[in-house]
Amino acid sequence: MVRSGSFSVDSSATHQRTPSRTVTLGHIQPQAPTYRTVYCNDRESNQPVRFKGNSISTTKYNVFTFLPKGLFEQFRRIANIYFLGISCLSMTPISPVSPITNVAPLSMVLLVSLIKEAFEDWKRFQNDMSINNSTVEILQDQQWVSIPWRKLQVGDIVKIKKDGFFPADILFMSSTNSDGICYVETANLDGETNLKIRKALERTWDYLVPEKAYEFKGEIQCEQPNNSLYTFTGNLVVQKQTLPLSPDQLLLRGCSLRNTEYIVGAVVFTGHETKVMMNAMNAPSKRSTLEKKLDKLIITIFCVLVTMCLIGAIGCSIVTDREDKYLGLHNSDWEYRNGLMIGFFTFFTLVTLFSSIIPISLYVSIEMIKFIQSTQFINRDLNMYHAETNTPASARTSNLNEELGQVEYIFSDKTGTLTRNLMEFFKCSIGGVSYGCGVTEIEKGIAQRHGLKVQEEQRSTGAIREKGFNFDDPRLMRGAWRNEPNPDLCKELFRCLAICHTVLPEGDESPEKIVYQAASPDEAALVTAAKNFGFFFYRRTPTMVYVRESHVEKMGKIQDVAYEILNVLEFNSTRKRQSVVCRFPDGRLVLYCKGADNVIFERLANGMDDVRKVTREHLEHFGSSGLRTLCLAYKDLNPETYDSWNEKFIQAKSALRDREKKLDEVAELIEKDLILIGSTAIEDKLQEGVPTCIETLSRAGIKIWVLTGDKMETAINIAYACNLINNEMKQFVISSETDAIREAEERGDQVEIARVIKEEVKRELKKSLEEAQHSLHTVAGPKLSLVIDGKCLMYALDPSLRVMLLSLSLNCTSVVCCRVSPLQKAQVTSLVRKGAQKITLSIGDGANDVSMIQAAHVGIGISGMEGMQAVMASDFAIAQFRFLTDLLLVHGRWSYLRICKVVMYFFYKNLTFTLTQFWFTFRTGFSGQRFYDDWFQSLFNVVFTALPVIVLGLFEKDVSASLSKRYPELYREGIRNSFFKWRVVAVWATSAVYQSLVCYLFVTTSSFGAVNSSGKVFGLWDVSTMVFTCLVIAVNVRILLMSNSITRWHYITVGGSILAWLVFAFVYCGIMTPHDRNENVYFVIYVLMSTFYFYFTLLLVPIVSLLGDFIFQGVERWFFPYDYQIVQEIHRHESDASKADQLEVENELTPQEARSYAISQLPRELSKHTGFAFDSPGYESFFASQLGIYAPQKAWDVARRASMRSRPKVPKK
């Protein structure tokens, strides 16, 4: 049913039934919000609408589409299309080579890829069957009947038991809990393991037993299926009564029921229309910069191929015209007088002959190398293993390994990324009086920078210290607040902390044993503070909050008070505040509000200027101490005003369109004329090793930007504490807290405020840019840093100022953006990525960092305290910020070096091989006669030179891991792209030309007139086999010359490849076929090996061909060394004991930590219980495959993760 023009639902319209519009998986249709009508417990009424079934399919193929669709996927690669065209050409009469030469390698590559696709899809199919055949109880004829998930339909009444998974998106109707609530774990959706509370409408509480549930005939008018996990708008119509629905009543597929015996609900969305399946869209596809440059190299090679073919075509036309009498071509039926036709056909003949210049095995080899790098090196590096949380590093994609070695800009969140996200209530301000005596880590760092010695803290007698509470001030403890100048405000602050939140208490209702389940550590810290101040929040129902208050009426008296929660105005990134309207037992109505200081100050009542001024000073002091601040306010409401407002609130809450916007507008009507209570200050300490890590990364040439939602003072001091900013730097500060902007805000004209801020931002940007450019042109000028707040950033990102902002930022070593929204984080990242064309990396730990992580070239997720959304959206996951040192300076740099060398080696060996064919065409009048046997040409890439390059890509190390971190400046070579420049390509191309000339000319010239042991002159196949043997030896030994770190695997693969060629030659040349009678390949190797000339050539030619490379490397090392070569020389005489290990981490862990790590790496069956690795003991990740490699998030991955169910612990009776 679609109605686009109204916000409310007319109950008379609920009997109309029109087909519901649906949305296919992964494609959210851009359409105006509409709604659907679902008839509960009435399949016949729902049947005409034809809602989607609950069966899901996450496979990519079926029996009929596998081959065509699989081949289509493979031929999306331009290289495969190229080889397909070459294979087709080789089947025509103009081809000088057998089709097997090109068809066999292409078929091998395609077969391996298709087998991989088939295996992965088969696993998905098996998983789909397991999920679709899971059972759920539905209501049929007044009793619960068990059916498979796939048979579930929209409108069915279902019963979900404790620890069971929701099979569809369900409207929560009733619960075994007397207060109509249930507890839900959403780990499969967002990784958060803290329980969420869901509330059924009181009108549906009675529909719990099958007899009562059978009587339920409600109608659900709700939004169309969409991918928003955290929103839901709709109405429930029961007996002509319309009740608004919210996300509190929706139980999403994939979540599990906890701490509740069972619940009853009505199915709203099924199958691919559930919210989690609608979210199952592919993550942004990322390709490394080096891979994009590889495409350009391939195009260049193709141009070289075309050039060679054009030379051959032109040469053939000329030679044929001059030599046609001798060749007798004028008597032929073919019209060879037409030079254009001769050139045309010769061109395509030579294309098939020279096709091997583009390596078919390049992409397969690189994928294999990257895969092993990820699974065996990054995932198993104990230097990046966090023993405290049993969390190893994990590469969720292997596509971007080498990108880690070229990062120039890092964009970092602060909370939970640079800091621990372990919040502790530290200080507060009440009624203009500051409380709290502690010294923060930031203050200690400031003192040390000024040469002051900080004494150890002397805590007061009886000071309380527990998780979330590190407050020391006897004036507020144990009822002493009653003697303060503002005891009433103290009482209001404590009540605000105890009431205005969404925290869920668990466990015994005693202060020592209770556990608070909070959406964020801040919330938990504030409620814990209220408890220690004597206002103990111990129980919650959908409509009540219970607080045990001490010392309120008189000293020492304890009383339990029940506060009725009438309305909750929820926090979001736009409002930046949260409010509750509550009724005291005596009937008093109060609005409590907490939020960002600038938001609260804008809504204060008149006459509070003095308190506001003092509180602002306290906030600035708290911020300069590195504390996170929050302001609190309240307002008494009279019943008439509240009733009038509540009607508007209910209307907004019942709206089906723009509900969030309408609720925000209604909230503005009551969140004004507030009385300021004070502020709180929470300490979030730096993570271990952050300052050292940042200093190391800065030495590596990486510029670090901090993007945070904290106030400017807090952000600046955190930046100081972690060595991002120091006193030697010149700071540019662009803030909205200027006199001109404040005056404009006081006048209240929004248009004028916008104009003034934009002008101020433009003026500051211009002024700062001029100073920055002048400073950069000054000899030994100071390093620069920029600090800008979110309000100014909004205008600085305007197209008219964006270029100026970018220019200033790129001149700065460090940038701090404070008070920024998630959108602004992504905008800043995109600005540098696209505007500066620099390699960017974003790192964060929360849902608000996802857009920033996806906007960067490389996204890093911190598996921290804020769920796993950041990890889910990331390319790599680590547990601590300090692990970036190893990830970038060791693995990133090595991967970049290795992939560069692999690509260059492939380019070199294929060009060398093809050029020998090209030189041979000059001897054959450009006729297209092939130089090598078809099988020689087919197996050159895939067998005889395949393994050594893979070993190079896995084990190449210029310096050890410890030296990589000791000399972070080495990383700059990756930033400069030193190993993949066109100059490097030219050097390798020159080497290929030289070696091909040596191998071809030496053998062909020296064999002229030479005879074998039978007295016969060497023929074509004798010479070509000799050249081929020299090539195989030379290009394989070249691997040893270019390797900085040679292992036994290098010798095994190089020797094995040469041996493989000789064994193949012995077997192949010993087989007589009808084809061989014409080609004369039969017995060639045996004839050659019977001559001294063969052994002399094999010894001399490879040495001469490699001599040029040897001399060049020596000259380069002595006169034009790379940075890593200088480091090698410095440490050349040191012990090589540490070089045996890939990573020097063998003795880093205690036996217990090593055991935990080993357990975390064991292959295991994928869990069906929860969704993410290491989020709590006994839980494992649906993302973690048994090999430990993480693919980019695909539709089927999300579907599989969110649709799992737990195995029953005991057999069902």
UniProtKB/Swiss-Prot annotation:
Residues 90-93, 320-346, 921-934, 1007-1013, 1064-1076 are extracellular. GO terms for molecular function: aminophospholipid flippase activity; ATP binding; ATP hydrolysis activity; magnesium ion binding. The active site is at residue 413. PANTHER family: PHOSPHOLIPID-TRANSPORTING ATPASE DNF1-RELATED, PROBABLE PHOSPHOLIPID-TRANSPORTING ATPASE. Disruption phenotype: Impaired growth of roots and shoots. Roots devoided of the characteristic trans-Golgi proliferation of slime vesicles containing polysaccharides and enzymes for secretion. Aberrant trichome expansion, reduced primary root growth and longer root hairs. Impaired pollen growth. Impaired ovule development. Reduced adaptability to temperature stresses. Expressed in petals and sepals, but not in reproductive tissues. In siliques, detected in the upper part of the seed pod and in the area between the seed pod and the stem, but not in developing seeds. Strong expression in vascular shoot tissues and in stomatal guard cells of young rosettes leaves. In roots, expressed in cells surrounding the xylem and in central and peripheral columella cells. Detected in developing and mature trichomes, roots, pollen and growing pollen tubes. Keywords: ATP-binding, Endoplasmic reticulum, Golgi apparatus, Magnesium, Membrane, Metal-binding, Nucleotide-binding, Plant defense, Protein transport, Translocase, Transmembrane, Transmembrane helix, Transport. The intracellular targeting signals and lipid specificity determinants reside in the catalytic ALA subunit. Belongs to the cation transport ATPase (P-type) (TC 3.A.3) family. Type IV subfamily. Changing residue 413 to A: Loss of internalization of phospholipids. Associates with ALIS1 to form a stable and active complex. Interacts with ALIS3 and ALIS5 in a heterologous system. The keyword Transmembrane applies. Residues 1-23 are annotated as: Disordered. Signal peptide: none annotated. This is Phospholipid-transporting ATPase 3. The chain crosses the membrane at residues 68-89, 94-116, 298-319, 347-364, 901-920, 935-954, 985-1006, 1014-1036, 1043-1063, 1077-1087.
